[in-house]
C-alpha cells in the first residue's frame, strides 16, 4: 500500500522539490523561475508544504500572508509529472486553504493566486473566481491569470471535508499507478 501524507516542507525535501520543478519546467515555468524557487526554499515567505508519496516529496507549494492586505497569496503549487492527474494538486490546494483559514496571522479573508492560462481552469474548478487577465503579465511573455478564493464563503469544516475527499481520491488514483 502506498503511503500518502501532507506535511510541512523540510530542508531534506529540497532535492525532490527541485526535481519536481525540473520535470515541469518546459511546460509550466519561465526562465529564471528555478532561481526564484531556490530562494523560496532557502527562505520561505510563509508556510510551505509537500505531499509525500512513500516519504518522498511529490508535490510542493506554500502561501504567504500579506500584512497590509486582507489576503494570502499562494506560491508555487506543482506536482511531479508522474503524478499529474492523480489529485495531488487538489490535495495540496485544499491543505493550504484549510491552513490559511485556521492559522493565518493576521487572519485573512481572501486567498489569491496568479497562474498561466493552462492552470487557471484548475483553480476555477476548485472554487476560485478569476479577477484579472494580464496579456504578457509574466516577463516570459505568458499571459497571467489572477484568481481569488473567498474564505468567508466557506468554513474550516467544509475545507476539511474537501481536503479529506481530495486525499481519498489521490490515494485511490496513486494506488492504480
Where are these regions (language model features)?
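Conserved beta-strand in the GNAT
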Residues: 50, 56-65, 71-78
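Conserved GNAT acetyl-CoA-binding A-motif
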Residues: 100-116
